């Protein structure tokens, strides 16, 4: 996904982010004060959205990378890569101004699998919605930031 979707998008539209080694790594951190102001895509678009939005607001120097060593990621089945790509592309389109809140939030993706004597069509409905920034949600500021899985008495783990 990184080499076929993310890296070409960064090269074409966000060359200042071309130095990012693993833009879709799944292992990243961000300060809450920055993240709570971002619109957050559902699914696989969240990483590239956070990367692009951070760069847009704070500049490329606000992004640091750390080598965490060798990571073994579970490989996805070939037919699941299409929906993942749709979510990444939709997140980028929104940041380029090509997708708005009025656009469809579910995209029908037609895929074809080889079967004896031809192909079989399958339609997957891919969610490309985005959640509003947390700071725009009524009551966010007054909410407690202690997760319910933390014990209030001793701050120990309940899990």
Segment roles from a protein language model:
Residues 8-12, 16, 57, 65, ...:
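Conserved, well-folded catalytic cores of nucleic-acid-processing
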Residues 1-4, 30, 45-49, 83:
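Charged, alpha-helix-enriched surfaces in structured cytosolic catalytic cores
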Residues 42, 52-69:
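Catalytic donor-sugar/metal-binding loop of nucleotide-sugar-dependent glycosyltransferases
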Residues 37-51:
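Donor nucleotide-sugar recognition loop
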Residues 76-159:
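Terminal low-complexity segments of carbohydrate-biosynthetic enzymes
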Residues 1-34:
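Acceptor/aglycone-binding surface of glycosyltransferases and processive sugar-polymer synthases
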Residues 64-80:
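Active-site donor/metal-binding and catalytic loop motifs
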